[in-house]
Amino acid sequence: MDNWNSVRNVSSDRQTSKTSENPPHTSNEYSGKPEFINLSPDLEENLDEKLMSAFPGLEPHVFQHSQSPLSHKDASLLATMPSVASSNPSLISSGSSQTGSPSQSLSSNKEPSSPGISPSNDSQSQNTNHTSISANPYVNNPSHTSRNPDSGSSLNTASHEVPSSKSDVNVQMLARLKSKSRQKISSSDPLEDLRLTLTECLNPINIVQAPKECAAILVNLMSNITQDDQKLVFLDLLKSKVGNSIYSQLVDGGRKLFLPKLRNWFVSAIRSKHDELIHLILLVLANLPLTTEKLAEVKFGKPILIVKKKSTNSVIRQLAENLSELAEKSFTIEQNRENEKSSTKNDSTVSSSAVVMAPAGPAMAPSASNKPSASSTTKSSNSKSKKKVTSISGTSFFKNLASSTKPTSASSSTKAPLTKQQTNPSTPLSSIMAGLKGREKEKDKDSGISSENVSNNREELPSFRKRSSSSRQSEEIASLQAENAVFSSDPASNDEKTGNKKRKKKSVSWKPDNDLVQVKFIESLNEEGAASVKTPHIYGNARDMDRQEARVAFGSHVEDDVENEIIWYKPVPIKFEISKDEIHPRGYKCGGNERNLTPEATSEIEREKNESKDISTFNIILDLPVIREFDDSRPPAHIKLVSSDTQATTELGFNGLVQQVSENNTNAYSATSNSQLSSIFSNLSSSISDASSNVLQNPSLSIPNYSNAI
C-alpha cells in the first residue's frame, strides 16, 4: 500500500507540474495531448448505469470503464476508495472526440473483445442499439497505447494528433495497411494480426477522413481471407455501426467488389450450414445501404430467400425476413433480365436460319421497270413492284427456291413463258423470317390455295458473301416488296397470273383383274395347323423341362411318354455256375473269420511275433533271479585272471573260465535247448558283473589269487 501511495504521489506531482506550466485550452481545438479530469464517485456510478442501459445484452466486464488500467488490485482499490481515484487524475485518461468534447474512458493493456452474438442467443439481441464502441478514437486501438514507467502498466493515451483536414490524414499508416492487406496472412497468430489490422483500419478518424482508402483495404482483406474463423473476426468487427461513410463506400465504391465477395461467403456458409457465419452476414447486410438494383446486380436475392425458407434457426429466419422484401424485388428483376436475354438470343438464332417467303395479299400491279425508285425505300411509299416466285422441277429443294418476275398486263389472259430470276444475295434474314411468318398466316386464312401452289412460292436462299452498301438498300426494298406482295385467292387466276403449272396429283389405282399379268394364290395348309394345335406340350418350355421331369419321376405319372412303348416278351433265362474257388481267386489278406491262411501268411505271422518282441521279455530270463543267493554247499567258483604277458595264457584262462562257469551252471541251465545257447552266451558278461557285485556284497566269498601259481 505504501508503494502504491508513493507512485500515486509521484504521478500527481508530475501532473500538477504539467498543468501549472501548460494551462488548459479554452478553445474547441484538439491539442493532441491527453487531458486528465477528476471523476467523482457519482459520475462513475452514473456512467456504469448509462453503459448498462445502452448495452443490455452485454456483460459488465465488456465496458472499459469497469477495468482498471493498472492491475486487479488497483481496480478493487479504486472501486472501494473513490476518493483515491478523484485525487489521482493520472490513473484516469480521457480523450476528446472530433468536436472537442471530452469523453471519459479507462482501458487495460489487453484490448477488450466483444462477445460474438451467436444465432442461438436470445432474439432480444437483434433490437440492441449497435452503438459504435469506437466512438472514442483511442478505444480498441493498440497504436495509442503508452507505457507508464512508474507503475509498469499501460494507459490508453493519444500518440498522434487528430487531423484537422483531409490533407492531414496519416498517409503512411494507410499505405502500410493497404500494402499489408494485399499480402496473405502468414503470421504465427493470423487472427490477432487480422484483428489489429481491422482495428486500425476502422478507426473513426480514418473512416471519416479517408473512407475510400479504408474500403479498399477491407476489400483487399476479404480477398486474402479463406478460413471461417477469419471471416467471423472480420464480420464481427464490421457488423457494428462504424460509420455510414464506410458502408456507402463498400457498396457504391469504385470497384464494387464488396457485395460479390460477401455473396460468395454467404453461399459458401449456406452450403456448409455455418449458422454463425450466416447470422453475421445478415447483420452486416442490415447495416448496408442496399437497394433492389444493387442486390440484383450481384444476385443476392435468391440466397436470402433460401435462408428464409429453409433455415432451422429462428433468429436467422427473422433477420432474413427483414430483408425479404428487398430480396423478392431483386429476384424479380433478375428473372426479368434473364428472360430478356433468352428472348434476344432466341430471336437472333431464328433470324440467322430463316428463309424468305412471299406472303399472300391483294393483287398489285407491277412496275414498268425492274429498277426500284428512290421513294420505295420508305414504308410510306405506294409504288411498289410485285414479286412472284416459281418452282423449277428437277432440282433440289434449296435450288428450287427461285423467284422470277413476269411483266404482264392486267388485260392479258395468256400465260407468259417462265423465267428464272434469283433474288438479291444480300436479302436480310429479318425480312426472310417476316416473309415466312406472313406466309403461314395467309395460308391458314385462305383455304382455297392448295399446298402445291404454296410450296412453289419460295425464294432462293441467299448466298453468304460480303455485302455492299447498295446491296443493303436493295435488301430493304425487297423486304418491303415481300411484305406487300399478295396472291389471289382463286387458284385459276393465281395460275394465270403467276404462270405456274398445276402439278398433277399422285394417286394409286388398281388395274382390273383381266389386265393382271401374274396371280399368286396363297393357301394355308390345314394339316400343319391341325398338327401344331394337336401336338401335346407336356413340359411347357425348355426352361421348365427339368422341373416337369422331376414331377413325372416322383409323381403319380410314372410312365415315360418320351420313349416308344414295345411289347413285353419273356427274357431268356441265364444260368450262373461259379465255383467257390472262383469267387475269391486271389484270396484276402485280411477280413476276419473268412481269412484264408496260406503257408506264406502263416510264416509271416510267426516272423512278426518274434520281430517286435524284446529280448528282456523272454520267460526264461524273467524266471531267473536277478541276484542269486550264495550256496555254501557248492564250492566257490575259481576265475583265473587273464594275463597280458602271453596270448596262450589268455586263451587258456578264458576257456578255463568258460568251462568252470558252464560246469557250475550246468544244473541251472540244464533245461535250455540248443537254440537258446546263443542268448545265454550273450548274457555271460552280465552274469560276470553280477558275480563281482555279489563278491562285494558277501565278504565270505573269496577269489583265490593265482598269481603265484602262474
Swiss-Prot record:
Spans annotated as Disordered: 1-42, 85-170, 361-510
Bias kind Basic and acidic residues: ranges: 437-447
GO biological process, one term: co-transcriptional mRNA 3'-end processing, cleavage and polyadenylation pathway
Feature: compositional bias, Polar residues: 1-30, 109-170, 421-430
Domain of life, source organism: Eukaryota
Keyword list, A-Z: Cytoplasm, mRNA processing, Nucleus, RNA-binding
The protein's name in its UniProt record: Cleavage and polyadenylation factor complex subunit C74.02c
